[in-house]
Amino acid sequence: MLRRMRLPYVRAAAPEVLATARAQRWDPAEVLRVLLAEEAKGRDAATQRMRRKAAGFPTGKTFGSWREQDSSIEVSTQSALRTLEWVGRAENLSISGPSGTGKSHFVEALAHAVIDADMRVAWFTLESLTATIGRARVDASIAKVVARICRSDLIVIDDIGSLPAGQDAAEAFYRVVDAAYERRSVAVTSNIKPSGFDTIMPKTLATTTFSAPRIRRSCHGSRLLVHRCWPASRRGTAGILRSVVGRLRRIDASF
């Protein structure tokens, strides 16, 4: 009957729970409470596993393997980001620095924490995002695909700038940023300095696929948390995300 009612976690826990209940003379209401709690716990765990698989994480790294004292990101800033309040406010996060500074590890750990907090995550590289939007172009389902991506509470676009971005990549990036505007958080990691962020997209984008005002609104409309992971010799870089920051009210932490 429990199988028919689709209560697999009650069925799995029932023998042990009922044996304990008999030995300790539990009230029937307590037995029911414990069994239903096991079902809820099991379903929550299954949902988290499903969401982790759907997110498409690259490595599975979490804060369990993160050494906050080894990062150039201040511990207080790490703690603030780990509260995930910025995700609830649909704020955006940009972390930049050379390879090997832990950008992707930290953002992936944050993304796992987002799922642990009962939210959804979509993880892309710029290349995989471009491929996803490109496949949707074949059957004219771009709007549906972008809408599906934006059902996630956090959208991660990892390692922007590792390769030159062509027109298709730029269009895919801006479609998602525009659709997520003031609705979802977008986290970006990049191996280029913030002052060079505006060089990775084709200059023709503003006059082709999207109008310039729409791009400005997409990039400037929500608050942005900017964190730089550059070595000490490269601190003080001018022009923090010149093409993106604009009128943002931002938290700018220098590392």
What are these language model-derived features?
Residues 16-20, 91-96, 195-198:
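Short hinge/gating elements
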Residues 82-90:
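Phosphate-binding P-loop
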Residues 109, 113:
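Active-site signature of alpha/beta-hydrolase-fold catalytic machinery across serine-
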Residues 90-106:
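Walker A/P-loop nucleotide-binding motif
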Residues 61-82:
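N-terminal pre-Walker A segment at the start of P-loop NTPase domains
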Residues 3, 7-58:
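Interdomain "pre-motor" coupling segment immediately N-terminal to P-loop NTPase/helicase cores
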